[in-house]
Amino acid sequence: MFRFDKEQIVLDIAGTKIGGQPGEYPTVLAGTIFYGGHSIIEDEKAGVFDKDKAEALIKTQEEMSDVTGNPHIVQTFGQTPEAIVKYLEFVGDVTDAPFFIDSTSGEARIAGANYASEVGLEDRAIYNSVNMAADEAELEALKETKLSASIVLGFNPMDPTVDGKIGIWEDGAGTIDKGLLEMAAECGIDKYLMDVAVTPLGQGAGVAVRTSFAVKSKWGYPVGSGIHNVPSAWDWLREYKKDHKEAWPVCDVGSNLIQQMAGGDFVLYGPIENAKMAFPACAMADIFISEAAKDIGTEPVEDHPFFKLL
């Protein structure tokens, strides 16, 4: 195991601590709800859904968080402005946990950010994300909200190397006019969650994971990813699982452990239905890391899985 010379920044988002030295704080786990095709949704555009089932899913994640000691975030996805506001209103009522404001639509993301600001949920809200594709209108609108936390996505299609990813955060790497960190700061963001933008196997997945070390060595910011997307994009596994369904959850949930072992502070582990698999697996990895890091001067916090599960 390893310890960074750079002082590590620990974010406090509504009482949830994200960051620190490997083995110090437990990995924060975010499960996605209201994703495209989610069975609990009745109308994706209008945001009509089964509230009882949605609450049960969130409460299960909450319970697993209590059991293992791994804090949780509700990754709240919405396709439209109307839908995401309804989802955020619901999430804000049923849990005290932080939540991601997530959508493929910039208009929907801003609608969610505006809603969170208007009703006093800005301290729990995390924008997803400031990235190279964000246009001026979205950035200007984000600036007008009260949000202070955001994922900053290190995706650089022109140069997917470690240096290319660092560059897109630092100065734009010749691809955009300024670095993503500067762009985020101009929008009022001062709590950066650095997403290393893991791409498919054979197309830079390993490089993205290695970027985790670089981020924490250079800036000390919390780092993580939605690494579970890697198995989803693996053609061989998609074919193999047709006859071997048991292989899928092993790779899907297991991918998160790779991010953790590379110094990750948070993982977006996929559908919230996977909470009962993801939390024990990630808690186990945290115990491994913490035990290994003790000899080099890193002590786990009181509610770490090392103390809760041993």
Swiss-Prot record:
Give me the reactions it catalyses.
5-methyl-5,6,7,8-tetrahydromethanopterin + coenzyme M + 2 Na(+)(in) = 5,6,7,8-tetrahydromethanopterin + methyl-coenzyme M + 2 Na(+)(out)
This protein's superkingdom?
Archaea
HAMAP family given for it?
A: MtrH (MF_01501)
Question: GO MF annotations for this entry?
Answer: tetrahydromethanopterin S-methyltransferase activity
Name used for this protein in its record: Tetrahydromethanopterin S-methyltransferase subunit H
Q: What does this protein do?
A: Part of a complex that catalyzes the formation of methyl-coenzyme M and tetrahydromethanopterin from coenzyme M and methyl-tetrahydromethanopterin. This is an energy-conserving, sodium-ion translocating step. MtrH catalyzes the transfer of the methyl group from methyl-tetrahydromethanopterin to the corrinoid prosthetic group of MtrA.
Q: What GO terms in the biological process aspect are recorded for it?
A: methanogenesis, from carbon dioxide; methylation; one-carbon metabolic process
Instruction: Tell me the subunit arrangement.
Output: The complex is composed of 8 subunits; MtrA, MtrB, MtrC, MtrD, MtrE, MtrF, MtrG and MtrH.
Which NCBIfam families does the protein's record reference?
A: mtrH, PRK00979.1-1
Q: Which family does it belong to?
A: Belongs to the MtrH family.
- State the species of origin: Methanothermobacter thermautotrophicus (strain ATCC 29096 / DSM 1053 / JCM 10044 / NBRC 100330 / Delta H) (Methanobacterium thermoautotrophicum)
Question: Keywords assigned by UniProt?
Answer: Methanogenesis, Methyltransferase, One-carbon metabolism, Transferase, Translocase
EC numbers, comma separated: 7.2.1.4
Biological pathway: One-carbon metabolism; methanogenesis from CO(2); methyl-coenzyme M from 5,10-methylene-5,6,7,8-tetrahydromethanopterin: step 2/2
